Amino acid sequence: MAIKIGINGFGRIGRIVFRAAQHRDDIEVVGINDLIDVEYMAYMLKYDSTHGRFDGTVEVKDGNLVVNGKTIRVTAERDPANLNWGAIGVDIAVEATGLFLTDETARKHITAGAKKVVLTGPSKDATPMFVRGVNFNAYAGQDIVSNASCTTNCLAPLARVVHETFGIKDGLMTTVHATTATQKTVDGPSAKDWRGGRGASQNIIPSSTGAAKAVGKVLPALNGKLTGMAFRVPTPNVSVVDLTVNLEKPASYDAIKQAIKDAAEGKTFNGELKGVLGYTEDAVVSTDFNGCALTSVFDADAGIALTDSFVKLVSWYDNETGYSNKVLDLVAHIYNYKG
């Protein structure tokens, strides 16, 4: 029996979550809520400048979407409490608007009949965050959870392997991050972040990110040991994390590479990093990861070691596809939780 999900918000992540769900037998999208017109919704699902045409049929019938012959209820409610998820048997609501990131606001989905809620962004309160390959085993039946951020999903698995093998004394992270929808096509008003208001296609823009600090929430042993920042760059998708750390146990760069490779292949960490962490020694660039479902692909040849305790590690991620696939992994994990 497939897990029935409803998606609130059909933007970049909402649509890529939907696309990813089409490749899973265990998850079925039964409802979508967004304020856009259903015909426009169908158009945006069919055609994607980054990921290409939708692999299947998309039609509109009686105000609903019909995708590959299956009818999906479409609504346009501003208040999640009015979504009546219960009427279509929604097990888990995927909150992808970016607007309801606290327990209080996301709980409206449960009022509407959903059993549980997954937030597709870092929570803005104490709502717990879970990252596959890092702390799924800490889930204890909570009805509202967060899948953290795309950058935390890249950084945390890598940091876990390094810390639990060699120990991280402290570290700094930089993410070179693709453009996102909040940025401006040309210079425009941005009262809180002046640099963020500059034209996205013209600039490399320094920005803040809470991704490194958030690692401490999913991996408590690293709480207070990592911080970081971002550079927004003029590419449409795929980002890369640069993690520079002081190690507690000296190690050669080859030993670090081997530890990450073993984890990626599922030979260590009880196989928890397989399907999450990747490893490559190829001469890759960002577009080589477009559409990659892994959330962190370690680039062995891009990293460097200054000493046997001070190293720079580089890991790629498709900030849309990888993250959206892990949203669905979290959906499946909390649905199948037995206590």
UniProtKB/Swiss-Prot annotation:
Belongs to the glyceraldehyde-3-phosphate dehydrogenase family. Its EC number is 1.2.1.12. The gene is gapA. Homotetramer. The active site is at residue 150. NCBIfam families: GAPDH-I. It is found in: Cytoplasm. It comes from the Bacteria. It catalyses: D-glyceraldehyde 3-phosphate + phosphate + NAD(+) = (2R)-3-phospho-glyceroyl phosphate + NADH + H(+). Keywords: Cytoplasm, Glycolysis, NAD, Nucleotide-binding, Oxidoreductase. Pathway: Carbohydrate degradation; glycolysis; pyruvate from D-glyceraldehyde 3-phosphate: step 1/5. GO terms for biological process: glucose metabolic process; glycolytic process. Signal peptide: none annotated. The record marks 177 as: Activates thiol group during catalysis. NAD(+) binds at residues 12-13, 34, 78, 120, 319. GO terms for cellular component: cytoplasm. GO terms for molecular function: glyceraldehyde-3-phosphate dehydrogenase (NAD+) (phosphorylating) activity; NAD binding; NADP binding. Pfam families: Gp_dh_C (PF02800), Gp_dh_N (PF00044). D-glyceraldehyde 3-phosphate binds at residues 149-151, 180, 209-210, 232. Catalyzes the oxidative phosphorylation of glyceraldehyde 3-phosphate (G3P) to 1,3-bisphosphoglycerate (BPG) using the cofactor NAD. The first reaction step involves the formation of a hemiacetal intermediate between G3P and a cysteine residue, and this hemiacetal intermediate is then oxidized to a thioester, with concomitant reduction of NAD to NADH. The reduced NADH is then exchanged with the second NAD, and the thioester is attacked by a nucleophilic inorganic phosphate to produce BPG. This is Glyceraldehyde-3-phosphate dehydrogenase.
